[in-house]
Amino acid sequence: MDTSDLFASCRKGDVGRVRYLLEQRDVEVNVRDKWDSTPLYYACLCGHEELVRYLLANGARCEANTFDGERCLYGALSDPIRRALRDYKQVTASCRRRDYYDDFLQRLLEQGIHSDVVFVVHGKPFRAHRCILGARSTYFANMLDTKWKGKSVVVLRHPLINPVAFGALLQYLYTGRLDIGVEHVSDCERLAKQCQLWDLLDDLEAKCEKVSEFVASKPGTCVKVLTIEPPPADPRLRADMALLADCALPPELRGDLGELPFPCPDGFSSCPDICFRVADSSFLCHKAFFCGRSDYFRALLDDHFRESEEPVASGDPPVVTLHDISPDIFTHVLYYVYSDHTELPPELAYDVLSVADMYLLPGLKRLCGRSLAQLLEEDSVVGVWRIAKLFRLARLEDQCTEYMAKVIEKLVEREDFVEAVREEAAAVAARQETDSIPLVDDIRFHVASTVQTYSAIEEAQQQLRALENLLVSIGLDC
């Protein structure tokens, strides 16, 4: 629903609504519809310059000489929009990153943090991680367990292996995304076939066909870079990374996982380099993921004051004992760290939220917020709202006030809601910033935003009167 609202708002040029959807509802700025179009494309097509600039500043992609970039330029309704697209520097580090998981994987690829293998392709080195290559590709899993087993440096001299194409292939394995110059597409297709990456091969062929049709139908366009991106909500990358979490689980917690694609510890090893001991359970993990995803674990594992125990035997990974957490709760942390997702039942959400806050995992906190949102009822909404405020979960807080607006006539009779309004008013008075009360303002906003027909006006007025009567009764005028 929020995604459809975003596309409609971009066509209308409603900057305020788009800002609300991106910043409060956490909608992805580069989402695509069934016509393979992005919010930025519709803003350009409909001539909304202010909205175009806002989207660019908030992470909308518009790389020069790519299919999406050329499409936005060609479809732009006005010259000022075309100039904004051409003048705007590539949105990477300068913008507010929205996909922290994608950002982490990109850094892992570019910086090679805690890498354990180096590929040298015609003299050009590529640092990589055995665990990721094995999880993402059966071909790499087999080669790392046979021909390349035990090697920290793998030299590839075959004349048909292009270093540029190999780098693009690694980008795909790490991020699910691929950027390649059109002159290297055939080299990339050859490598994809050799590595048995059939999905990538199909995507490359489909993209080449789409770009050819676009260039032929739009004179003056020039596509020099081919970009492959996973479709919205594509589970392949995260599902592959979740296999590493499966391997990290101690045997007593694997339950009904069944046979793993590369059983641990026999057969192909996920090559763990750190062991977390939680109560009586041992999780065999990878520093690259935990240090890259969490400043807490980076300080614990990389800094000089780490509290590691000696390995039990030569060749075993070092052991770090974690306190004040149960194996069940750590399992949710584990799957989030590897795959950016965990199946989180609402009854565990608060416990996981507390741990996510301690381990400095903001994305896991947001997942907990989504789970807590399932608990919204008249009896619980104030308590959930307090949790959202405490842990700074803006989206959950907004969902709470939206729900409060729907049931405000009943809430005004509840003591916990009245107390929440008093506390908000007291906090504002202490700061002396404004006469309004944030909680009350948010409820008023949601009451007003639901009014779309004349029949809804009377209901909204009745809801607002109930709120105003409460404020008067407790001596607040705002």
UniProtKB/Swiss-Prot annotation:
ANK repeat locations: 1-31, 35-64
Broad class of the protein's primary localization: cytoplasm
Gene Ontology MF term list: translation elongation factor activity
Record bears the keyword Coiled coil: yes
Keywords for this protein: ANK repeat, Coiled coil, Cytoplasm, Elongation factor, Protein biosynthesis, Repeat
Coiled-coil blocks: 450-478
GO cellular component: cytoplasm; ubiquitin ligase complex
Positions of the BTB domain: 115-182, 272-346
Keyword field contains Heme: no
Annotated localization: Cytoplasm
PROSITE patterns: ANK_REP_REGION (PS50297), ANK_REPEAT (PS50088), BTB (PS50097)
InterPro entries, sorted: ABTB1, Ankyrin_rpt, Ankyrin_rpt-contain_sf, BTB/POZ_dom, SKP1/BTB/POZ_sf
UniProt-listed CDD domains: BACK_ABTB1_BPOZ, BTB1_POZ_ABTB1_BPOZ1, BTB2_POZ_ABTB1_BPOZ1
Listed PANTHER family: ANKYRIN REPEAT AND BTB/POZ DOMAIN-CONTAINING PROTEIN 1, ANKYRIN REPEAT AND BTB_POZ DOMAIN-CONTAINING PROTEIN 1
Annotated function: May act as a mediator of the PTEN growth-suppressive signaling pathway. May play a role in developmental processes.
Name of the protein in question: Ankyrin repeat and BTB/POZ domain-containing protein 1
